[in-house]
Every structure is written in C-alpha cells, then in structure tokens.
Amino acid sequence: MKLFGTDGVRGKAGEFLTPFLAMKLAMSFGECLPKKTGKILVGKDTRRSGYMIENALVSGLTAIGYDVIQIGPMPTPAIAFLTEDMRCDGGIMISASHNPYYDNGIKFFDSFGNKLSQEFEEKIEKRYFENNFNLKTEKEIGKSKRIDDVIGRYIVHIKSSFPKHVNLNGMRIVLDTANGAAYKVAPTIFTELGADVITINDEPDGFNINQNAGAMHPEFLAKKVLEYRADIGFALDGDADRLVVVDEKGEIVNGDKLLGALAYYLHKQNKLKNNGVAVTVMSNGALEKFLNDMGIKVYRSNVGDKYVLEVMKEKDLNFGGEQSGHIIFSDYAKTGDGLVSALQAVAYLIQSGKKASEAFDLFELYPQIQANIQVSSKPPLNEIEGAKELLDEVEKEGYRHLVRYSGTENKLRLLVEGESENKAKELLVKLKEFFKSKLS
C-alpha cells in the first residue's frame, strides 16, 4: 500500500502529510464506511500540526455529508472507546504516537472502535486514488461541533477497569505524560482513586511532545521516582497507548517482565480467558517458559499491536502485548491503553503486598544477541539454499532465532536467544557469516 503503514498513515506534517492529503483521505474513509448515524468522531494529540490536519479532516467529512464531533486532545484508546460509546460510524485519531513533533499521523477506527483491517485500508486507498468523490449540495453538507466534556466518559470507563475493593490511598505515583494526549486525563484518574500523584512533562506547547520525555525516555521518570521516593512510576507515550513502568528503586521494568507479571495476576484471579496470552516474535523465550510452567499457552504474532490483537481475536483471548509497552486488556479496551495497563499494574502491585522491584521481577530473561547485516537484495529467506538447515541446527541446540528483513532499510535483522550468552554469540556469528555470504 502507498499510504497506509503498520498503524495508519504517518509522515512529516506539511510535507507528506498535507491538508490536501488529509482532506482526501477523510472523504475516502467516509465514503467507504457503512453510513448509519452519519457521525464521525475526531480527536488528536498535542502536536501543533494537529490543528491543520483536524480542520482538513472536518472539511473533507462535512463535504461528503457527515457530521463531525471534535473532542480535542485525548488518548488514542479514548477515541476507540468513544467512537462506539457515542454511536459514531467511525473515529479518527490525529497522532504520530511516539514520534517527534514534526511528524503526524491519521489512525482510523470502525463503528465498534476497532482498528481497520488491511482489506478496508486497501479499499480507502483505492477510493483515494480514484479521486472521484460524491460531494454534497449546500443543503446536504454536514456540520461540526466541538465537545469538551467527553473526558468524563472516558475517565469513568477507565476507572471501571480498577478493582472496586482496592484504592490508592497512601501510594505515591509519578506520572510522565510525555507532554502528550493524556496530560489532563492521566493525573485526574490516579488522583480520583486516592493516589498522591506527581506529574511531569504535562505542559504541552505543540512542539515538546515525546521530547526527552515519556515512554521513549523513561530515564527521566526513573530520576523523579527516586527524587520523590515514590512507590512506582508510569511513563506514557504521546498518544498514551504505550506504558513503561519504573520501580521504587528507579529501575525500568523490562517489557516482557511486565507482561509476565500481569498475565500471572490475571491467571491467579481466574480472569485469563482460555488460559492464553498473545505476544510478538520479539518477546523473550523466558517469558514463554514462565507462562508455560503455570499452564498458560503462549501465542506469537508479528510485531505490532494490531497483529497481537488479531491473534487475540483468533484464539479468543483477553490479554496480550508487546515488550515495547503496547498492552491489550480486551475486556476494557479495543487497543493498547497505557492507562488501563497502569491501573492493572498498580492493582497487582497492591494485592501482591510487595515492593514494585520484587513484584515485577518474577523470572530471569534469557540473553538475546542481535545483529544487522547490509544486504544488496531481499530474496525470500526460505528460498536461500542452506538457510533452513542452518536455522534447524540453531533450534536443535535449544536456541530461538529470529531472522527478518527490515521494513524500511536494506538490512537483515538477526536475533539468537537462549540460556548461555556465549553459545548464543557463537550461533549468531554462524548466522551472520552465512547470510553475509548469500546476501551482501
């Protein structure tokens, strides 16, 4: 596809992502949707370019007869929830997630708050390039209205995911909202539940989103957790669909260890649907062993929360995630939601009766050794003579491997993982030399 990437349409604002592109994309989306209520919800993060893109989207949608509800800066998962809750035909989020301020993006949701399938995205692209839209007459043009009080609906929804018999009284929590979409909603939720909240990076100016802040730079949160002697710290990214946790010692909790602890928490409460968890191919093998030892099945997907969700639907699961911090509790959210994940993490912490440094350290990770090699071509890996035999050899040694081409560069990415770091290095050297001889 020419426009859509792994998570909507994304690029440099004003260069790739122009108002013309946004307007046409909005019309294409609107004309592909089944029209029921005639309403589409639009939200955004805190980037300056959000104003430009929002107005272009509204222009395109009203031109083809839709009424638009604009709700201002809100997390991506809030758009997913509110689209369904407010009976809209579709939802649009303007955000480039964890990218710098100069990028922006457009994410689409159907009337149930689900991200679009690849087939639906292809349909939108086809409409976009046909460039022949059904513009409405002056009497049929849609209207737009801005609603600023929907934040309350989302707060009530998020708080409903937290156990009613638990409160956060006496707990000190540092929140890093990355100067992004959750800068108002995150501290409100934790304060209402009784926590002593210290918020950092909560003064967006249109340019400072994700800048040395949030889930991409948790080292700043780590310093503040120590400085304020907090029990735990949570870092979100620009659109609050990702979570990074810092324990009371100022240590960043590994993403796979976080997934393991949350799966353990659900399992102990008999809330883990079909006793299974969806993770990606990047998750550490030690997580899989830890879960298997409890009788929990592990299913792996391609990288991307969208693919994790596909596996969750296919296997009828209610929990999954990526080591990068996209965690999906599908009983409460249709997509990764950093705030739902943070509330589940703190509920587990309180009920464990332990310090965060112990509660989230339930197993040791296997060493992972990685390398990239430059390639001059990208033939299918299964067609390279001798590749299957070599990879089988790695597996026979009891080591896991991941060999894949980069989606954006002329590189082959290699990973070997297992109990011994030295053995993993030795096997990686073998793989590196073999693929270099075949592809460089």
Curated annotation (Swiss-Prot):
Binding site for Mg(2+): S97, D237, D239, D241
UniProt keyword list: Isomerase, Magnesium, Metal-binding, Phosphoprotein
Presence of keyword Metal-binding: yes
Domain of life: Bacteria
Any single GO BP term: UDP-N-acetylglucosamine biosynthetic process
Residues found modified as Phosphoserine: S97
InterPro entries reported in the protein's UniProt record: A-D-PHexomutase_a/b/a-I, A-D-PHexomutase_a/b/a-I/II/III, A-D-PHexomutase_a/b/a-II, A-D-PHexomutase_a/b/a-III, A-D-PHexomutase_C, A-D-PHexomutase_C_sf, A-D-PHexomutase_CS, Alpha-D-phosphohexomutase_SF
Job description of the protein: Catalyzes the conversion of glucosamine-6-phosphate to glucosamine-1-phosphate.
Protein name as it appears in the record: Phosphoglucosamine mutase
Organism: Nautilia profundicola (strain ATCC BAA-1463 / DSM 18972 / AmH)
